[in-house]
Amino acid sequence: MKILIDENMPYAAELFGQLGEVVTKPGRTLSADDLIDIDALMIRSVTKVNHNLISKANKLQFVGTATAGQDHVDQALLAERGITFTSAPGCNKVGVAEYVLSALMVIGQQQGFSIFDKTIGIIGAGNVGSYLAQCLDALGIPYLLNDPIKEQEGDTRQFHSLEAIKAQCDVITVHTPITKDGEYPTHHLINEAFIDALQPDAILINAARGPVTDNQALKKALQLSQSGLGKKLTAVLDVFEFEPHVDLELLPLLAFATPHIAGYGLEGKARGTTMVFNRYCAFLNIDQAVEASSLLPIAPVPNVSLSRKWDDATLFSLIQLIYDIRKDDALFRRNMVVTKGNEAQMATAFDQMRKNYWDRREYSAITVTGKVGFGVESLAKLGFTVVEDIQ
């Protein structure tokens, strides 16, 4: 049995190596020839599974993507060919939500506001959007949800129109797949008209899919904003419309920019790999399930003891102990600027940052000790490991 794996799937070679012969290759450059005599294909979102890719796949029986998103896979084609497909829904939800919180905490510090005074608009109430809402609930931060598909399916949560989101929310964060068809397409959902309707001083975050945001419209709006000719707008992009190619005129206008790593926490990547591995084991009728937590190293972060009830400053410090978006932003800008004028080098640099991404951890890696009156229960709901001090 031969299993072809994206080289950027952590722990995959070791796990799948227990089941057969493993071949690893860069996911973005996979070709039809690579799939000859391959029984199973394990990928991430950079690999487009379409007719061209599997045209020579003479033995392929199983395709797994270690990502929450599925829009890079032609599932109808796989079904037509009798090839089993699986994904890893929700594997990265914690990392993406923590990315958004880090961005907002830092922007709040820079612009002089408290995140607790803002209303957040969440577009897309799937795994990521729902988990972010759960985090905001833990902190008591108001938010509005928008997901017309979930609403039509009978989801009983309170949903709001895009018009309400634009009119009432200070922050809008997008967590949708990319779709061009159907009643509610998301391609260029964030377009010129959408941006024009935002509140003054709005903050826009896209950590979903690049083409959800019309990058040219966003660039125009940010240029007007920063020249004083338009409404003040702050934008954070983890994804770009034509990645791994990045518009270097847009880049300096962004508050923060990163190379599609919002969900790249070590726990999330381990979850994605183990979810796909476990489903492949089930496909093979092998009882060999693995827990993601069993693969993780001890986190190199300090434990924290609270001496008083936490406040904005405490929360900021705790969040930055785990993830400070400024670190990734600075490295990304340096790597992109030095490739100016060379599209091939830019694409390589973009992918290398993802391939060699540092071992970012989730809030659960920090143990916070404090008395009940110090608000530790809220930190526990946010994801931190909490020990109540009963002394």
Curated annotation (Swiss-Prot):
The keyword NAD applies. It is an enzyme of class 1 (oxidoreductase). It catalyses: 4-phospho-D-erythronate + NAD(+) = (R)-3-hydroxy-2-oxo-4-phosphooxybutanoate + NADH + H(+). NAD(+) binds at D147, T176, D238, G263. GO terms for molecular function: 4-phosphoerythronate dehydrogenase activity; glyoxylate reductase (NADPH) activity; hydroxypyruvate reductase [NAD(P)H] activity; NAD binding; protein dimerization activity. It is found in: Cytoplasm. It comes from the Bacteria. Pathway: Cofactor biosynthesis; pyridoxine 5'-phosphate biosynthesis; pyridoxine 5'-phosphate from D-erythrose 4-phosphate: step 2/5. Keywords: Cytoplasm, NAD, Oxidoreductase, Pyridoxine biosynthesis. The active site is at R209, E243, H260. The keyword NAD applies. One of its GO terms (cellular component) is cytosol. Substrate binds at S45, T67, Y264. One of its GO terms (biological process) is pyridoxine biosynthetic process. Its EC number is 1.1.1.290. Catalyzes the oxidation of erythronate-4-phosphate to 3-hydroxy-2-oxo-4-phosphonooxybutanoate. Homodimer. Belongs to the D-isomer specific 2-hydroxyacid dehydrogenase family. PdxB subfamily. This is Erythronate-4-phosphate dehydrogenase. It comes from Photobacterium profundum (strain SS9).
